[in-house]
């Protein structure tokens, strides 16, 4: 329905809340993995409830109604096909993230705390590229349905250029201010956590162009009614990421940096 600002605000708020709760539960209360889990569940629940309430209040067309029931001309099968592919894609992504998190945890609480905070900053940093991919998907789907293929071609050409330019800018900012960004959530005396988190941000931030392109590819294939290809891309991306993370981090000379570098390689 064209409103991408509200989900962006709620998702950003959820990420900030997650960071704050991670610091409280993991760094201050020393709750470890359980604390990180609590922080994630609470922040996502707040975001989800907030979005549901907003939708019910602001979008009458999306409210459930049992007064009119009709399966005539219903595209239920198509909805199931699209949603199943999207659900499996999200499940694969979460499973991959879980495996990476488990590997990170094996390096101790300092690395775990740094990763927990840095990955939230990382998520906020590339969030605009992700939302750009979602908007790109909507534009592609509308023109694909209208058979306006010339507009799709032009959109693809310009969107990749715009996304790449924006991602380069964000990469530069994250690389320059990585310590400052970590310092927003970690006290100055915890220098080791800041150093590890900064290393993660510089490594990931140097390759935001890759994830920007990946989001556009996801959006393109969803837009042309081929969500299964987006699923395949996700499996390949995460499979590469997880396999390399476990392989590279096994070398003592590389250590946790092997996890950091495997993520953008997977993009």
Explain the meaning of each model-derived region.
Residues 3, 13, 25, 32, ...:
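Hydrophobic/aromatic residues within transmembrane alpha-helices of membrane transport systems
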Residues 1-7, 11, 114-172, 176-178, ...:
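Small-residue-rich hydrophobic transmembrane alpha-helices
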Residues 50, 77-143, 163-171, 201-211, ...:
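Transmembrane helix-bundle signature of multi-pass secondary active exporters and lipid flippases
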Residues 30-84, 140-207, 249-267:
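Short alpha-helical transmembrane segments in multi-pass integral membrane proteins
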Residues 12-20, 24, 42-53, 91, ...:
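Generic alpha-helical transmembrane segments of integral inner-membrane proteins
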Residues 1, 7-18, 36-51, 133, ...:
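Short runs within selected transmembrane alpha-helices of multi-pass transporters and secretion channels
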Residues 22, 101, 134-138, 218, ...:
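Interfacial helix-capping/hinge residues at the ends of transmembrane alpha-helices
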């Amino acid at each position: 329905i064209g409103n991408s600002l509200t989900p962006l605000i709620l998702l950003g708020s959820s990420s900030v809340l997650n960071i704050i709760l991670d610091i409280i539960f993991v760094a201050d209360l020393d709750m470890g993995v359980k604390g990180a889990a609590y922080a994630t569940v609470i922040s996502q629940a707040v975001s989800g409830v907030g979005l549901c309430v907003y939708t019910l209040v602001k979008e009458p067309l999306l409210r459930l109604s049992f007064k009119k029931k009709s399966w005539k001309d219903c595209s239920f099968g198509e909805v199931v096909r699209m949603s199943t592919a999207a659900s499996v894609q999200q499940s694969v992504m979460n499973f991959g993230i879980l495996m990476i998190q488990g590997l990170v945890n094996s390096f101790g609480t300092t690395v775990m705390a740094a990763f927990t905070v840095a990955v939230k900053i990382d998520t906020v940093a590339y969030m605009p590229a992700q939302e750009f991919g979602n908007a790109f998907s909507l534009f592609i789907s509308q023109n694909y349905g209208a058979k306006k293929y010339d507009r799709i071609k032009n959109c693809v050409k310009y969107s990749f250029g715009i996304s790449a330019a924006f991602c380069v800018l964000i990469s530069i900012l994250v690389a320059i201010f990585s310590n400052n960004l970590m310092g927003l959530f970690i006290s100055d005396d915890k220098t080791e956590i800041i150093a590890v988190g900064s290393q993660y941000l510089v490594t990931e931030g140097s390759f935001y162009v890759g994830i920007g392109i990946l989001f556009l590819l996801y959006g393109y294939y969803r837009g042309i009614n081929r969500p299964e290809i987006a699923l395949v891309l996700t499996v390949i991306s995460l499979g590469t990421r997880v396999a390399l993370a476990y392989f590279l981090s096994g070398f003592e000379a590389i250590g946790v940096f092997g996890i950091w570098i495997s993520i953008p390689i997977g993009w």
